[in-house]
Structures are given as structure tokens and as C-alpha cells.
């Protein structure tokens, strides 16, 4: 169906956004899947529309937000009564959030945009309940709103909305079961529905009323979407990267995906950071220093997304690489900077970067024969909130000086 609103209907929807109270928001990590699927379903016979969509998606992933705004505005002009253009415009706002999750001032704009897309899809589905495009964009709007709520620690609303969103995903899958892009959504559900209860026991009660997942099947489905998806292959590859890195601990596969994505989108700070993280996990210290050193250069150049939080991470890992190479004086400079940045950034609680940088400073002091200064550092670490085994390490080095 080629459905269009008249101008009056679009204006009415826009006016409603001024007063509409957002409903309970969506999804645990399970329901990131509608968002990816919505992006996947720009199915159209219009080659111009298709080409514009691909161009805009690439611009978003490469953080070319101004260019993407212009590109997706063309979608709105081409099809003002369909949700695609409005949804993708909000994806620009989403990536503005993603590259700096501590910054909340884009939240309201994003939520309002997703509400508008949901309203538009509901109006289409009221007349045509089997409209696949409307189902996917509605699922996308719900999923991305929930994803933000999950990041903002509103887990109850996320789980409740995940329950609401699941039937939308199932309906869309039944309508188009052979679409490889859909496998991203079903794969995400299958994977995370099994993983979350074991990885996050506190969230287990929130998942009692949703179907059980299948970790292996989900991973296979996401991999297929990554290889064969038309529009969702990038999202699927990024998801696979995160899964291999955080849950499967397969750092070789994660590293390959990170460099593949970064090669295609060389201005994407998240893909860049994962290259460095994976090199660290693989134990390649020269590569760690090279990747995070380049990130430091981009921070100094003021490149988009390369903010103080990124600088802190890069500085910490560069410091570690120098420490491994016994460049202790240079490593101290990096750890001092990491501590300085942490004191600026840690507004809620002490971060792992602050804890570990202070622990490393103490170890270096020991290695330099500055025992009294080292002991003072370990006392500082013990006074901080524990991160991993930081207290055990500090107590150990209090009794026995660190050695190389």
C-alpha cells in the first residue's frame, strides 16, 4: 500500500505532540530488535527512495549528522504521509545521544520524535492492520524509546514495554518470514532472552512473562542478518561485535568486526573505541597504543564524538601500554590525566577509570622505589568504591610492594 496523509492530518499529529504524555516506555535489551528491524524495512519499489535511505543511513553511522538531516528530509518530501523519513530523522538524534550517553539534553527531542512516528503508524494500522512497513516503524519507535529508558535505568518501564512490543515483532515476522533483515530482530530476542537472566540476575523477574530464548539460534540469526541483510547488516554487525566482546568473549571475532566497521565508517568514534578495546583484550600492546594514540589525536583535534569521556578511556589504555613497556614516567602522565578527567566526569559515583588509574599510579611508585607514596595511593584506592578486585589488589600491595 502506498499510504499518504493529507496536510491537515500531518499538522494535527504535530500539534498533538505538544501535549501528549509519553506512555510507559519500552524494552530491556531484548527489544532493541524492533529498532533494528524498523531500519531494515524501507522496502520500496522506488529506487530513488531506496538510494536516499541507504545514503542517509551511511551518513548517520559516519556521524555526518548535518548531511543526514538533509538526506532524510528528502524522504519526508518524497513521502510525507509515511513514517520512514520522520523515523530516520530521529535516528540522527539517537546517535547524538549514543556518542555521549551522559548528555541528556537530546532526550526529549528524541522521545517526541518517536511518539510522532508511533502515532503515524497507529493511524495507518487502524485502517490497514497488516501493513508491514507500519508495523516495523512502530516497533522501531517503541524499541528505541525503550532502549533509551534502559540506558536511563528505568528497567520496569523497559520490561513492561518489551512485553507490549513483542507481538508487533511476531506479527511482522509472520508477514515477511523470508526477509534476512527480520532475522536481526528475532535473533536479538532469542539471544538476549536467554542471556539476560544469567548475566543480570536482578532483571530475571522482569522476564518471567515473555517466551524463552535460544542463545545459539539467536547468534546464528544475527550472523545471517549481518552477512545478508539489505539495510540491517550494519546494525547486525555492530550487535555481533558487542555480543562477541561482552558475552561470548571471542575477542578475535570482535576485533575483525570492529575493524571492518571502522574501515567503512572511519569517523565513528564507537567503532574506533572498540578497535582499541579488542586489541587490549587480545593483548596486543603496540596495537593498543597505536589505536588509542590516534583517538587521543582526534580528541585534541575536536572531532565529533571524541569528547572527554573518550579521552579518559584512551589515556588510561595508552598509560597501560607505556607501563607494560616500562616507560613509567610517561605512563604516570597518562594516569594523572585519567584521574584528572575522572574527577571532572564522575558526578554520580567513582568510575572504574578513577579507581584503576590510582591503583596503577601506586604500582608505578612501587616500581620506582617510592614506597611511601605507593602506600598512600593504595589507601586512596581502599577509600574508593570497589571496582572489580581493586580492594584486594590494594591490600595485597600494601603488604607486598608491586614488582614488575
Predicted regions and their residues:
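Register position in tetratricopeptide repeats
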Residues: 95-96, 144, 151, 192, ...
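Short coil/linker segments at helix-helix boundaries
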Residues: 42-51, 59-71, 81, 89-178, ...
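"A position-specific structural signal for the A-helix of alpha-solenoid helical repeats
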Residues: 54, 88, 95, 137, ...
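Residue-level recognition of tetratricopeptide repeat
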Residues: 82, 131, 179, 232-233, ...
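TPR/TPR-like (Sel1-like) alpha-helical repeat modules
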Residues: 166, 170, 210-214, 219, ...
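Amphipathic alpha-helical segments of tetratricopeptide repeats
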Residues: 76-77, 119, 166-167, 226-227, ...
Amino acid at each position: 500500500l502506498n499510504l499518504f496523509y493529507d496536510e491537515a492530518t500531518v499538522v494535527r499529529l504535530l500539534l498533538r505532540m505538544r501535549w501528549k504524555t509519553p506512555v510507559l516506555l519500552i524494552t530491556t535489551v531484548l527489544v532493541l530488535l524492533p529498532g533494528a528491524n524498523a531500519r531494515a524495512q524501507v522496502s520500496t519499489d522506488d529506487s530513488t527512495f531506496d538510494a536516499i535511505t541507504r545514503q542517509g543511513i551511511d551518513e548517520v553511522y559516519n556521524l555526518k549528522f548535518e548531511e543526514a538531516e538533509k538526506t532524510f528530509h528528502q524522504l519526508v518530501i518524497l513521502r510525507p504521509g509515511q513514517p520512514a523519513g520522520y523515523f530516520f530523522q530521529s535516528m540522527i538524534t539517537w546517535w547524538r545521544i549514543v556518542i555521549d550517553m551522559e548528555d541528556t539534553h537530546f532526550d526529549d527531542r528524541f522521545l517526541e520524535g518517536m511518539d510522532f512516528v508511533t502515532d503515524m503508524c497507529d493511524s495507518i494500522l487502524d485502517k490497514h492492520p497488516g501493513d508491514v512497513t507500519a508495523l516495523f516503524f512502530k516497533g522501531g519507535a517503541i524499541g528505541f524509546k525503550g532502549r533509551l529508558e534502559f540506558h536511563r535505568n528505568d528497567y520496569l518501564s523497559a520490561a513492561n514495554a518489551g512485553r507490549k512490543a513483542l507481538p508487533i515483532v511476531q506479527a511482522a515476522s509472520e508477514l515477511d518470514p523470508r526477509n534476512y533483515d527480520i532475522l536481526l530482530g528475532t535473533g536479538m530476542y532469542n539471544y538476549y532472552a536467554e542471556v539476560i537472566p544469567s548475566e543480570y540476575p536482578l532483571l530475571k523477574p522482569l522476564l518471567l512473562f515473555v517466551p524463552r530464548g535460544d542463545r545459539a539460534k539467536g547468534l546464528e540469526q544475527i550472523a545471517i542478518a549481518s552477512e545478508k541483510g539489505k539495510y540491517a547488516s550494519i546494525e547486525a554487525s555492530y550487535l555481533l561485535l558487542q555480543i562477541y566482546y561482552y558475552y561470548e568473549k571471542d575477542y578475535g571475532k570482535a576485533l575483525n568486526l570492529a575493524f571492518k566497521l571502522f574501515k567503512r565508517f572511519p569517523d565513528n568514534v564507537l567503532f574506533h573505541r572498540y578497535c582499541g578495546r579488542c586489541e587490549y583484550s587480545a593483548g596486543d600492546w603496540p596495537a593498543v597504543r597505536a589505536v588509542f594514540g590516534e583517538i587521543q589525536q582526534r580528541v585534541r583535534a575536536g572531532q565529533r564524538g571524541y569528547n572527554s569521556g573518550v579521552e579518559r578511556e584512551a589515556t588510561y589504555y595508552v598509560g597501560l601500554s607505556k607501563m607494560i613497556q616500562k616507560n613509567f614516567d610517561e605512563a604516570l602522565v597518562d594516569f594523572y590525566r585519567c584521574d584528572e578527567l575522572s574527577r571532572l566526569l564522575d558526578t554520580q559515583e567513582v568510575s572504574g577509570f578513577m579507581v584503576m588509574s590510582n591503583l596503577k599510579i601506586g604500582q608505578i611508585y612501587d616500581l620506582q622505589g617510592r614506597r611511601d607514596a605507593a602506600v598512600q595511593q593504595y589507601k586512596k584506592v581502599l577509600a574508593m568504591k570497589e571496582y572489580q578486585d581493586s580492594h584486594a589488589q590494594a591490600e595485597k600491595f600494601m603488604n607486598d610492594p608491586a614488582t614488575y
